[in-house]
Swiss-Prot record:
Designated name of the protein: Large ribosomal subunit protein bL9
Keyword Phosphoprotein set for record: no
InterPro entries named in the record: Ribosomal_bL9, Ribosomal_bL9/RNase_H1_N, Ribosomal_bL9_bac/chp, Ribosomal_bL9_C, Ribosomal_bL9_C_sf, Ribosomal_bL9_N, Ribosomal_bL9_N_sf
PROSITE patterns cross-referenced by the UniProt entry: RIBOSOMAL_L9
UniProt xrefs under HAMAP family: Ribosomal_bL9
Gene: rplI
Disulfide bond positions: none
GO annotation (BP), single: translation
Keywords: Ribonucleoprotein, Ribosomal protein, RNA-binding, rRNA-binding
Molecular-function annotations in GO: rRNA binding; structural constituent of ribosome
Organism the protein comes from: Geotalea uraniireducens (strain Rf4) (Geobacter uraniireducens)
Lineage of the organism: Bacteria, Pseudomonadati, Thermodesulfobacteriota, Desulfuromonadia, Geobacterales
One of the record's GO cellular component terms: ribosome
Family: Belongs to the bacterial ribosomal protein bL9 family.
Record function comment: Binds to the 23S rRNA.
């Protein structure tokens, strides 16, 4: 089934792209959530008229992503966890905990967009990549200290 994307969808396409997807994916996810329209001739004509608006929306989303990336780049998360004598944590710091800490500081990010090379299991300073937009990534500084 062909659909016209109304939002940027990772691994699928950008706003305004006409893509072919499985019918179930379109019916059960993309169309009900408002992420896409069915690619009919009527919707294609409406898309032609809305191209300028979509381009404006793309630029606006990209600019918002860049502003958010600048906020995240200036952010340093300080976490305190219980640790053993060798600095090994009892448990691990995961992307979900980082998302909660960022939310507490006023930046709401989906935990799936925070990428850790591996879960943090030791005390020290670490970096995490935050994938805000397909074209915009930010680096988050994380410091884990002993509680």
């Amino acid at each position: 089934m062909k659909v016209i994307l109304k939002e940027n969808i990772e691994n699928l396409g950008h706003i305004g792209d006409i893509v072919k997807v499985a019918p179930g994916y379109a019916r059960n996810y993309l169309l009900p959530k408002g992420f896409a329209l069915e690619a009919t001739t009527k919707n294609a004509k409406a898309l032609d008229h809305a191209k300028k608006h979509l381009e404006y929306k793309k630029n606006k989303v990209l600019e918002q992503a860049r502003v958010l990336a600048a906020k995240i780049e200036g952010l340093a998360l300080n976490l305190s966890h219980q640790a053993g004598e060798e600095g090994k944590l009892f448990g691990a710091v995961t992307n979900m905990e980082l998302a909660e800490q960022m939310k507490a500081q006023g930046i709401e990010i989906d935990r799936k967009k925070i990428i850790l090379a591996e879960p943090i299991k030791h005390l020290g300073e670490f970096t995490a990549t935050v994938k805000i937009h397909p074209e915009v990534n930010a680096t988050l500084k994380v410091t884990v200290s002993k509680a």
